[in-house]
Structures are given as structure tokens and as C-alpha cells.
């Protein structure tokens, strides 16, 4: 990192990327600006360069390159400001980048939104705001940890993946720390803190709505078994986008020949298929909330004697 001005903070190759993607413009559009001191664009580029330096800001200030750099308080104020709309910045940058990528790919290629969650561990932390005790269901560990659930929304065309939105989810029942009372309740930072105390199914429809409103083109939402629940499927379907997701055997009911059955009995009523050895059966049915779906049963690769179920609200799709 050099101290010769804003334009010299990045290597030429990275500076070209910043210019092409208009990153500083997206920062301004998200309200990430300052009226005095080091500019937000300058601070953002400094923090970005830390990735390639392999140091945190504390170590950078101890190095020989620290002359003329902002103090750590300036960096922390920049990162922690509740008035900066980082969600708008990420969505604006990603939507703009997706439009550039889409212009270079086949327009007939299906484009999807992908919902997933993972564990964001902070086991050594004690005073982190909204820190909670969470259960890790998304890995093989199946254990409790201190931290958050990281709910993410991404876009893909099968060859490119682009992050669109994310939410760090805490818990009202097992929270360790609460919301900082000094946060202005009118800011976007406070709204994200309130969102963190909600559930993933309540946050997902809003995330999808923001993505579609920003101009992101997608035909399907892909989800795993933790999110393929009938109320959430209905909320997404009402936004004009179809859902494809893995379904687990629960008490959810499906209508076949005027009979309501669970997933296991639905498998028995499904029509066997012979055109692919790993595709066992398929059936057209209706969920309890009135949405018609197609359920395809495939062979479990980890246990050939068992099956997995994939649900789609687009009944015109083939089994493949």
C-alpha cells in the first residue's frame, strides 16, 4: 500500500476492475460517503488491499508502510457506521455485474437464485452485538456454537455465481448479547439488527423481492430441505418466480386422486420411470396451500436403497 493518493492504492490490474465495475459509484449510490476526513472510497480501497497484504489493520499500522495511513479508529468508524447501506451497495454492484455477464452468455441459459445458510462462528467472542448460541445443522458436526447463522442469496447461470444479499441471523431465545441501545432506530443498521432477530423464512421473501426489484433476471429459486416448506414456497411463488428444492419427509400433505398423503405415501403413488436409472418416480400433485407441484424421486447416491425427493412449482419441467 502506498501513500501517493487515491489512484495509487490498487495495482493496475485491480484498478481496472474497480473502474470497469464502477465500485466507487456504487458506494456513493448506497449513501456510503463522508463530508470530511479520508473519503469512503479511499478507506474502501485500503481495506480491499489488506487481502493481498495478508495483514489486518493493526499489523499494517505497525509496518513500515504505516506513514500517512488513517488510524484504526477511522477504519472502525467506517466499517461500523449504521448509516451506511452496505446491503444496497452489494445488491447494486452485483446487479450491475450480472448485466455485464448476461450480455456475454446465451440468453436461453436458465438463471436461478440460490438460497443457503451456513454457520458463522465467533466462539472466542464475548461482547459481539447480538451474539447467540446457535445449532449447526448445515454440516456433519451437528453441534452448538457461538456466533450467527449466515443466510445468503446468490445468482447463477450455471457457470457464474454472484452474491446478491446476506443476513446474519441471531436468536431471541438463545441470545447472549442484545442490540446496542445507542444505535439510531431510523438507520438501516438498526433495521438489519431487528432483521437478525427474526427467522430465515421471514427474511427470504424480502431478499428475493429486493433482488428482483433491482433488475436481476432469474426464473427459479433453488433451496435445500430446510427452506422447502409450503408457506415459504407460496410466498416466493406469489412474486412470480418458481421454486425448485429438496423435500424431506415431514407431515406436509399432498393431494393425489382426492386423497391427502405424506411424502412416503406419495412415493408409492408416483409413476415409475424407466428412462434413467437414477430417476425412480415422478408425480404431479397439489400442496395443502393449493399450489400445483411436480415431485421427482431420485436415487440417493450415498445409499442406493433410499430415495430423495425434489419438488418444482414449474410442472412443465422434465424429470432430468
Where would I find each of the regions flagged by the language model?
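Short low-polarity hydrophobic stretches
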Residues: 46, 60-61, 116, 153, ...
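Single, function-defining residue in the core of a domain
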Residues: 1-36, 44, 108-111, 126-127, ...
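Short, charged/polar micro-motifs that form catalytic or ligand-binding hotspots
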Residues: 50-51, 65, 139-143, 194-197, ...
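Gly/serine-rich nucleotide phosphate-binding loop at the start of the catalytic core
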Residues: 1-87
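Active-site-proximal, Lys/Arg-enriched surface segment
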Residues: 27, 81-173
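Hydrophobic, Leu/Ile/Phe/Ala-enriched alpha-helical segments that form helix-helix packing faces
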Residues: 50, 97-101, 105, 208-215
